[in-house]
């Protein structure tokens, strides 16, 4: 039987009727049978024992199977293996993939149309985003242009130069005032009216600053939108307070209505507020509230008074050795506490304190007044006039008790001798 199996016809190599794995199994079986015969013959001669022959036979069979499996090759690479591909194989594989990818990119055109590549669809969301960014940039640019137009309309740069030239010794007060005006007048739409309060001792330039402001705004907006109200002149008697209330309320309402039509911001200056009756202060306070129509929010109110002047004088004299100009917050709180005792309307006001004037500022006041009246500016004469005033003396500094209030009267006494 074994001979018949060994003599079985083998198909020619040209035609493979059995798959490669089956042929490998057949060869293994033939090899095993051949080895069994040879091993048995050796054992029969007595050279080896039966157990050692079996062990050797199993070892040989396993080695033959391993070597035969390694040496067997397949006609096609159809099965997965753990062999690490070489660089040449990787390069070849990538070239094949590129070639296949290029083949798949060919576009088939119908015979009756013009050959052209399909148009890529652009994202509509991207277009909308670009449009939105463009609109925002345009609005920002337009807002900046409007701010510049408003500031130019009120000529605040010219106002600042005028104040710095004609108001002596109040550099910090002018800077704070201009900051508030520039911030508020940059636009026509606001959520509250601007309430400024000029406070300080007598003769330091509060009323003079108010007159310069009124003159400037009359020239840039119109005389109809600027109101100057002096308490001792317009409402001298407390018995007339009811009539004063009606007059003030009517003037404010009418002026605001006209200004809203022409898109202008009116300016109201109330001087000598320390003499104003409480009932009249209540009327003003009602216009400072936030819960009003829009036209009543686009207004500038300026309150000028001596309230807090004593506290400012005391603060300046106590801080002569220090740079009291570097303590604005402390001075602001001192003045505000004094104003709150007088009336609650100052809770919504921006405090602009005017401090004491030094002797060098008094000399400037005399020089300016002499030139204004046509006198020759003799330095010795100016020193003589300034020496007639009273001063607080602290260290090496002299602060005028009455400020520049008596300068005009002193210069007027010189006129009979010209």
From Swiss-Prot:
<protein>
    <recommendedName>
        <fullName>Torsin-4A-B</fullName>
    </recommendedName>
</protein>
<keyword id="KW-0067">ATP-binding</keyword>
<dbReference type="GO" id="GO:0005788">
    <property type="term" value="C:endoplasmic reticulum lumen"/>
</dbReference>
<dbReference type="InterPro" id="IPR001270">
    <property type="entry name" value="ClpA/B"/>
</dbReference>
<dbReference type="GO" id="GO:0016887">
    <property type="term" value="F:ATP hydrolysis activity"/>
</dbReference>
<dbReference type="GO" id="GO:0005524">
    <property type="term" value="F:ATP binding"/>
</dbReference>
<feature type="transmembrane region" description="Helical">
    <location>
        <begin position="128"/>
        <end position="144"/>
    </location>
</feature>
<dbReference type="Pfam" id="PF21376">
    <property type="entry name" value="TOR1A_C"/>
</dbReference>
<keyword id="KW-1133">Transmembrane helix</keyword>
<comment type="similarity">
    <text>Belongs to the ClpA/ClpB family. Torsin subfamily.</text>
</comment>
<dbReference type="InterPro" id="IPR027417">
    <property type="entry name" value="P-loop_NTPase"/>
</dbReference>
<dbReference type="InterPro" id="IPR049337">
    <property type="entry name" value="TOR1A_C"/>
</dbReference>
<dbReference type="InterPro" id="IPR010448">
    <property type="entry name" value="Torsin"/>
</dbReference>
<dbReference type="GO" id="GO:0005635">
    <property type="term" value="C:nuclear envelope"/>
</dbReference>
<keyword id="KW-0812">Transmembrane</keyword>
<keyword id="KW-0472">Membrane</keyword>
<dbReference type="Pfam" id="PF06309">
    <property type="entry name" value="Torsin"/>
</dbReference>
<feature type="binding site">
    <location>
        <begin position="200"/>
        <end position="207"/>
    </location>
    <ligand>
        <name>ATP</name>
    </ligand>
</feature>
<dbReference type="GO" id="GO:0016020">
    <property type="term" value="C:membrane"/>
</dbReference>
<keyword id="KW-0547">Nucleotide-binding</keyword>
């Amino acid at each position: 039987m074994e001979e018949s199996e060994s003599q079985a016809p083998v198909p020619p190599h040209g035609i493979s009727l059995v798959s490669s794995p089956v042929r490998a199994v057949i060869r293994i079986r033939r090899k095993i049978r051949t080895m069994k015969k040879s091993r048995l013959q050796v054992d029969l001669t007595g050279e080896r024992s039966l157990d050692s022959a079996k062990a050797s036979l199993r070892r040989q069979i396993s080695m033959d199977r391993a070597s035969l499996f390694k040496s067997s090759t397949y006609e096609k690479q159809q099965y997965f293996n753990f062999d690490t591909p070489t660089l040449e194989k990787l390069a070849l594989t990538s070239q094949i993939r590129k070639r296949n990818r290029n083949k798949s990119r060919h576009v088939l055109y119908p015979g009756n149309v013009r050959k052209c590549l399909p148009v890529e669809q652009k994202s509509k969301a991207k277009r909308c985003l670009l449009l939105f960014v463009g609109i925002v940039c345009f609005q920002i640019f337009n807002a900046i242009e409007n701010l510049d137009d408003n500031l130019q309309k009120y000529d605040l740069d010219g106002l600042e130069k005028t104040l710095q030239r004609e108001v002596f010794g109040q550099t910090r007060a002018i800077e704070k005032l201009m900051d508030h005006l520039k911030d508020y007048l940059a636009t026509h739409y606001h959520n509250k009216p601007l309430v400024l309060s000029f406070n300080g001792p007598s003769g330091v330039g509060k009323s003079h600053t108010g007159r310069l402001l009124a003159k400037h705004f009359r020239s840039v907006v119109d005389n109809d939108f600027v109101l100057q109200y002096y308490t001792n002149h317009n409402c001298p008697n407390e018995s007339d307070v009811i009539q004063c209330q009606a007059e003030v309320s009517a003037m404010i309402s009418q002026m605001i209505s006209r200004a809203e039509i022409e898109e202008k911001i009116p300016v109201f200056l109330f001087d000598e507020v320390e003499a104003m009756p409480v009932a009249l202060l209540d009327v003003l306070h009602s216009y400072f509230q936030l819960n009003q129509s829009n036209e009543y929010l686009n207004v500038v109110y300026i309150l000028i008074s001596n309230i807090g002047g004593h506290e400012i004088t005391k603060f300046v004299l106590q801080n002569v050795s220090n740079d009291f100009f570097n303590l604005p917050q402390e001075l602001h709180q001192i003045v505000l506490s004094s104003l709150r005792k007088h009336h609650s309307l100052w809770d919504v006001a921006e405090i602009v304190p005017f401090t004491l004037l030094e002797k060098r500022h008094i000399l400037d006041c005399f020089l300016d007044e002499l030139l204004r009246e046509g006198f020759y500016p003799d330095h010795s004469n100016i020193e003589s006039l300034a020496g007639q005033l009273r001063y607080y003396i602290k260290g090496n500094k002299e602060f005028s008790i009455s400020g520049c209030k008596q300068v005009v009267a002193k210069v007027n006494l010189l006129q009979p001798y010209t």
